[in-house]
Protein backbone atom coordinates (compact mmCIF):
# COMPACT_ATOMS: atom_id res chain seq x y z
CA UNK A 1 0.00 0.00 0.00
CA UNK A 2 0.99 3.63 -0.34
CA UNK A 3 -0.32 6.78 1.30
CA UNK A 4 -1.12 9.62 -1.13
CA UNK A 5 -1.51 13.25 -0.11
CA UNK A 6 -4.71 14.98 -1.32
CA UNK A 7 -3.94 17.36 -4.18
CA UNK A 8 -5.71 19.74 -6.56
CA UNK A 9 -4.28 20.92 -9.87
CA UNK A 10 -5.90 23.12 -12.49
CA UNK A 11 -5.73 21.96 -16.11
CA UNK A 12 -8.04 24.53 -17.72
CA UNK A 13 -6.85 24.89 -21.35
CA UNK A 14 -5.31 28.13 -22.58
CA UNK A 15 -6.76 27.78 -26.10
CA UNK A 16 -10.04 26.43 -27.46
CA UNK A 17 -9.41 25.54 -31.09
CA UNK A 18 -10.44 22.05 -32.19
CA UNK A 19 -7.01 20.49 -31.71
CA UNK A 20 -6.65 22.00 -28.22
CA UNK A 21 -10.08 20.64 -27.29
CA UNK A 22 -9.23 17.16 -28.56
CA UNK A 23 -5.97 17.21 -26.61
CA UNK A 24 -7.86 18.25 -23.49
CA UNK A 25 -10.33 15.39 -24.01
CA UNK A 26 -7.41 12.99 -24.33
CA UNK A 27 -5.72 14.34 -21.20
CA UNK A 28 -8.91 13.98 -19.13
CA UNK A 29 -9.56 10.49 -20.47
CA UNK A 30 -6.03 9.27 -19.91
CA UNK A 31 -6.12 10.54 -16.34
CA UNK A 32 -9.05 8.15 -15.81
CA UNK A 33 -7.12 5.23 -17.33
CA UNK A 34 -3.72 6.11 -15.84
CA UNK A 35 -2.15 6.32 -19.30
CA UNK A 36 -0.84 9.89 -19.51
CA UNK A 37 2.54 8.44 -20.46
CA UNK A 38 1.00 7.38 -23.79
CA UNK A 39 0.13 10.95 -24.81
CA UNK A 40 2.08 12.28 -27.78
CA UNK A 41 1.82 15.38 -29.94
CA UNK A 42 -0.47 13.53 -32.35
CA UNK A 43 -2.19 10.84 -30.26
CA UNK A 44 -5.38 12.86 -29.63
CA UNK A 45 -7.08 11.71 -32.85
CA UNK A 46 -6.65 8.00 -32.21
CA UNK A 47 -7.66 8.39 -28.57
CA UNK A 48 -10.83 10.24 -29.53
CA UNK A 49 -11.83 7.38 -31.83
CA UNK A 50 -11.52 4.91 -28.95
CA UNK A 51 -14.06 6.69 -26.74
CA UNK A 52 -16.79 7.60 -29.24
CA UNK A 53 -19.03 5.34 -31.34
CA UNK A 54 -17.59 4.38 -34.72
CA UNK A 55 -21.02 4.68 -36.35
CA UNK A 56 -23.38 7.65 -36.14
CA UNK A 57 -24.28 8.25 -32.52
CA UNK A 58 -27.60 6.82 -31.35
CA UNK A 59 -28.25 7.37 -27.61
CA UNK A 60 -30.68 4.43 -27.56
CA UNK A 61 -28.05 2.01 -28.84
CA UNK A 62 -24.66 3.42 -27.83
CA UNK A 63 -23.91 3.15 -24.13
CA UNK A 64 -20.54 1.40 -23.89
CA UNK A 65 -18.44 4.50 -24.47
CA UNK A 66 -16.70 7.04 -22.27
CA UNK A 67 -18.60 10.16 -23.30
CA UNK A 68 -18.22 11.93 -19.95
CA UNK A 69 -14.74 13.14 -20.91
CA UNK A 70 -16.28 15.08 -23.82
CA UNK A 71 -17.94 17.40 -21.30
CA UNK A 72 -14.58 18.80 -20.19
CA UNK A 73 -13.92 20.33 -23.62
CA UNK A 74 -15.46 23.80 -23.53
CA UNK A 75 -16.70 25.54 -26.66
CA UNK A 76 -17.17 29.32 -26.73
CA UNK A 77 -19.33 30.83 -29.48
CA UNK A 78 -20.07 34.44 -30.41
CA UNK A 79 -23.19 34.71 -32.57
CA UNK A 80 -24.82 37.91 -33.81
CA UNK A 81 -27.79 36.31 -35.57
CA UNK A 82 -28.93 37.60 -38.93
CA UNK A 83 -30.33 34.38 -40.44
CA UNK A 84 -32.96 31.84 -39.38
CA UNK A 85 -30.24 29.25 -38.83
CA UNK A 86 -28.34 31.52 -36.48
CA UNK A 87 -31.50 32.42 -34.58
CA UNK A 88 -32.36 28.73 -34.21
CA UNK A 89 -28.84 27.99 -32.96
CA UNK A 90 -28.96 30.70 -30.28
CA UNK A 91 -32.42 29.51 -29.23
CA UNK A 92 -31.10 25.95 -28.89
CA UNK A 93 -28.32 26.98 -26.50
CA UNK A 94 -30.62 29.20 -24.43
CA UNK A 95 -32.82 26.17 -23.77
CA UNK A 96 -29.93 23.72 -23.29
CA UNK A 97 -29.38 23.08 -19.54
CA UNK A 98 -25.64 22.47 -20.01
CA UNK A 99 -24.96 25.77 -21.80
CA UNK A 100 -25.00 29.39 -20.68
CA UNK A 101 -25.79 32.39 -22.88
CA UNK A 102 -24.91 36.02 -22.17
CA UNK A 103 -26.61 38.71 -24.22
CA UNK A 104 -24.98 42.07 -25.04
CA UNK A 105 -21.94 41.76 -22.79
CA UNK A 106 -19.23 44.01 -24.27
CA UNK A 107 -17.95 44.95 -20.80
CA UNK A 108 -18.56 41.53 -19.23
CA UNK A 109 -21.62 40.10 -17.52
CA UNK A 110 -24.51 41.34 -19.62
CA UNK A 111 -27.94 39.76 -19.49
CA UNK A 112 -28.03 36.03 -18.78
CA UNK A 113 -30.52 34.30 -21.05
CA UNK A 114 -32.01 31.11 -19.63
CA UNK A 115 -35.02 29.00 -20.41
CA UNK A 116 -36.80 30.47 -17.38
CA UNK A 117 -36.10 34.17 -18.03
CA UNK A 118 -36.31 33.84 -21.77
CA UNK A 119 -38.28 36.39 -23.80
CA UNK A 120 -40.77 34.32 -25.77
CA UNK A 121 -40.27 36.52 -28.85
CA UNK A 122 -37.09 34.54 -29.38
CA UNK A 123 -33.49 35.66 -29.89
CA UNK A 124 -33.17 39.07 -31.51
CA UNK A 125 -31.42 39.66 -34.84
CA UNK A 126 -28.35 41.84 -34.55
CA UNK A 127 -27.84 41.20 -30.83
CA UNK A 128 -24.51 39.79 -29.58
CA UNK A 129 -24.86 36.41 -27.90
CA UNK A 130 -21.89 34.97 -26.02
CA UNK A 131 -22.42 31.23 -25.67
CA UNK A 132 -20.57 28.73 -23.49
CA UNK A 133 -21.24 25.06 -24.15
CA UNK A 134 -19.26 21.82 -24.30
CA UNK A 135 -18.26 19.16 -26.80
CA UNK A 136 -20.73 16.57 -25.52
CA UNK A 137 -23.69 18.91 -26.09
CA UNK A 138 -22.80 19.18 -29.78
CA UNK A 139 -21.88 15.50 -30.07
CA UNK A 140 -25.09 14.10 -28.57
CA UNK A 141 -27.38 16.63 -30.31
CA UNK A 142 -25.67 16.61 -33.69
CA UNK A 143 -28.35 14.65 -35.54
CA UNK A 144 -31.09 16.93 -34.21
CA UNK A 145 -29.13 20.08 -35.00
CA UNK A 146 -28.02 19.01 -38.48
CA UNK A 147 -31.59 18.07 -39.36
CA UNK A 148 -33.11 21.28 -37.98
CA UNK A 149 -30.54 23.48 -39.70
CA UNK A 150 -30.52 21.51 -42.96
CA UNK A 151 -26.75 21.11 -42.88
CA UNK A 152 -24.65 19.07 -45.27
CA UNK A 153 -21.64 19.14 -42.96
CA UNK A 154 -21.33 18.42 -39.23
CA UNK A 155 -22.43 20.79 -36.48
CA UNK A 156 -18.78 21.08 -35.47
CA UNK A 157 -17.89 22.36 -38.94
CA UNK A 158 -20.89 24.68 -39.04
CA UNK A 159 -20.01 26.34 -35.74
CA UNK A 160 -16.32 26.84 -36.58
CA UNK A 161 -16.83 30.39 -37.83
CA UNK A 162 -18.47 31.37 -34.52
CA UNK A 163 -15.75 29.96 -32.26
CA UNK A 164 -13.92 32.17 -29.79
CA UNK A 165 -10.46 30.75 -29.14
CA UNK A 166 -9.52 33.04 -26.23
CA UNK A 167 -12.71 33.88 -24.29
CA UNK A 168 -12.95 37.05 -22.22
CA UNK A 169 -15.30 38.22 -19.48
CA UNK A 170 -18.23 38.39 -21.92
CA UNK A 171 -18.58 34.63 -21.49
CA UNK A 172 -19.51 32.33 -18.64
CA UNK A 173 -16.10 30.75 -18.06
CA UNK A 174 -15.53 27.07 -17.23
CA UNK A 175 -12.60 25.76 -15.17
CA UNK A 176 -11.14 22.24 -14.96
CA UNK A 177 -9.45 20.74 -11.89
CA UNK A 178 -7.81 17.38 -11.22
CA UNK A 179 -8.47 16.19 -7.67
CA UNK A 180 -6.63 13.36 -5.91
CA UNK A 181 -8.27 12.17 -2.70
CA UNK A 182 -10.18 9.19 -1.32
CA UNK A 183 -13.29 7.69 -2.89
CA UNK A 184 -15.24 8.71 0.22
CA UNK A 185 -14.39 12.36 -0.50
CA UNK A 186 -14.98 12.23 -4.26
CA UNK A 187 -18.51 11.09 -3.39
CA UNK A 188 -18.98 14.37 -1.52
CA UNK A 189 -18.23 16.34 -4.69
CA UNK A 190 -19.88 13.96 -7.15
CA UNK A 191 -23.25 14.81 -5.59
CA UNK A 192 -23.10 18.26 -7.19
CA UNK A 193 -24.87 17.81 -10.53
CA UNK A 194 -23.49 21.06 -11.94
CA UNK A 195 -20.06 19.42 -12.22
CA UNK A 196 -18.80 17.49 -15.23
CA UNK A 197 -17.12 14.44 -13.70
CA UNK A 198 -14.68 11.80 -14.97
CA UNK A 199 -13.17 9.53 -12.31
CA UNK A 200 -10.25 7.12 -12.45
CA UNK A 201 -11.25 3.59 -13.35
CA UNK A 202 -11.05 0.78 -10.82
CA UNK A 203 -13.03 -1.39 -13.21
CA UNK A 204 -10.24 -1.68 -15.75
CA UNK A 205 -7.10 -0.53 -13.93
CA UNK A 206 -5.16 -2.76 -11.52
CA UNK A 207 -3.08 -0.37 -9.37
CA UNK A 208 -0.86 -3.21 -8.13
CA UNK A 209 0.63 -3.74 -11.60
CA UNK A 210 4.07 -2.16 -12.11
CA UNK A 211 2.85 0.13 -14.91
CA UNK A 212 0.14 1.53 -12.60
CA UNK A 213 2.32 2.21 -9.57
CA UNK A 214 2.60 -1.27 -8.05
CA UNK A 215 0.49 -0.46 -4.98
CA UNK A 216 -3.09 0.35 -4.05
CA UNK A 217 -3.09 4.07 -3.14
CA UNK A 218 -4.90 5.19 0.00
CA UNK A 219 -5.85 8.75 0.85
CA UNK A 220 -3.54 10.25 3.47
CA UNK A 221 -5.62 11.84 6.23
CA UNK A 222 -5.38 12.74 9.92
CA UNK A 223 -5.54 9.40 11.72
CA UNK A 224 -4.62 10.67 15.19
CA UNK A 225 -3.53 7.83 17.47
CA UNK A 226 -4.89 5.18 15.11
CA UNK A 227 -2.33 5.29 12.28
CA UNK A 228 -1.18 1.70 12.85
CA UNK A 229 -4.76 0.41 12.83
CA UNK A 230 -5.52 2.10 9.50
CA UNK A 231 -2.20 1.01 8.02
CA UNK A 232 -2.84 -2.63 8.96
CA UNK A 233 -6.41 -2.48 7.63
CA UNK A 234 -5.29 -0.99 4.32
CA UNK A 235 -2.45 -3.50 3.95
CA UNK A 236 -4.94 -6.32 4.49
CA UNK A 237 -7.29 -4.83 1.88
CA UNK A 238 -4.45 -4.60 -0.64
CA UNK A 239 -3.36 -8.17 0.03
CA UNK A 240 -6.93 -9.44 -0.37
CA UNK A 241 -7.17 -7.54 -3.66
CA UNK A 242 -3.95 -9.13 -4.89
CA UNK A 243 -5.16 -12.56 -3.82
CA UNK A 244 -8.33 -12.18 -5.88
CA UNK A 245 -6.33 -11.00 -8.87
CA UNK A 246 -4.00 -13.99 -8.59
CA UNK A 247 -6.96 -16.33 -9.11
CA UNK A 248 -7.73 -14.46 -12.36
CA UNK A 249 -10.62 -12.33 -11.12
CA UNK A 250 -10.84 -9.09 -13.07
CA UNK A 251 -10.24 -5.71 -11.41
CA UNK A 252 -13.96 -4.92 -11.54
CA UNK A 253 -14.57 -7.93 -9.27
CA UNK A 254 -11.46 -7.72 -7.09
CA UNK A 255 -12.11 -4.05 -6.28
CA UNK A 256 -15.06 -5.05 -4.10
CA UNK A 257 -12.68 -5.62 -1.18
CA UNK A 258 -11.16 -2.13 -1.38
CA UNK A 259 -12.39 0.42 1.20
CA UNK A 260 -13.74 3.93 0.68
CA UNK A 261 -10.35 5.30 1.71
CA UNK A 262 -8.85 4.01 -1.54
CA UNK A 263 -7.23 6.83 -3.48
CA UNK A 264 -8.99 8.16 -6.56
CA UNK A 265 -8.31 10.80 -9.19
CA UNK A 266 -11.19 12.84 -10.59
CA UNK A 267 -11.43 15.48 -13.30
CA UNK A 268 -14.03 18.15 -12.55
CA UNK A 269 -15.16 20.93 -14.89
CA UNK A 270 -17.79 23.55 -14.14
CA UNK A 271 -18.78 27.14 -14.76
CA UNK A 272 -17.07 29.52 -12.35
CA UNK A 273 -20.41 30.58 -10.91
CA UNK A 274 -21.30 26.94 -10.28
CA UNK A 275 -17.93 26.32 -8.64
CA UNK A 276 -18.69 29.20 -6.30
CA UNK A 277 -22.02 27.59 -5.38
CA UNK A 278 -20.26 24.30 -4.62
CA UNK A 279 -17.63 26.03 -2.52
CA UNK A 280 -20.22 27.82 -0.42
CA UNK A 281 -21.33 24.34 0.63
CA UNK A 282 -17.88 22.70 0.90
CA UNK A 283 -15.15 25.28 1.54
CA UNK A 284 -14.39 26.73 4.96
CA UNK A 285 -12.87 29.75 3.21
CA UNK A 286 -16.22 30.33 1.48
CA UNK A 287 -18.15 30.09 4.74
CA UNK A 288 -19.24 26.43 4.70
CA UNK A 289 -19.90 24.76 8.06
CA UNK A 290 -20.34 21.18 9.20
CA UNK A 291 -18.44 19.73 6.22
CA UNK A 292 -16.18 16.66 6.27
CA UNK A 293 -12.64 17.94 7.07
CA UNK A 294 -11.08 16.11 4.11
CA UNK A 295 -13.69 17.62 1.77
CA UNK A 296 -12.90 21.06 3.19
CA UNK A 297 -9.22 20.48 2.40
CA UNK A 298 -10.01 19.87 -1.28
CA UNK A 299 -12.59 22.65 -1.52
CA UNK A 300 -10.23 25.18 0.04
CA UNK A 301 -7.55 24.34 -2.54
CA UNK A 302 -10.05 24.90 -5.36
CA UNK A 303 -11.11 28.14 -3.67
CA UNK A 304 -7.49 29.34 -3.74
CA UNK A 305 -7.25 28.67 -7.48
CA UNK A 306 -10.48 30.52 -8.22
CA UNK A 307 -9.48 33.50 -6.10
CA UNK A 308 -5.80 33.74 -7.06
Please state what every model-predicted region is.
Residues 1-308:
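Family-specific signature for flavin-dependent thymidylate synthase
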Amino acid sequence: MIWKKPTVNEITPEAYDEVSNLKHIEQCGRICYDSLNKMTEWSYGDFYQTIVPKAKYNPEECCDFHLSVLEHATIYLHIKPSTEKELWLVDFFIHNPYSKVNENAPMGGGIRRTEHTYNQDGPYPGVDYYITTNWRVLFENEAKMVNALGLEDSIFDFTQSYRTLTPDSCYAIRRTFVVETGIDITREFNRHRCLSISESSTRWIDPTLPNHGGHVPFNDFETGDHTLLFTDAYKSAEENYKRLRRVSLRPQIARKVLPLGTGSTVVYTAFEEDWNKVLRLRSKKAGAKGVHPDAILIADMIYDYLNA
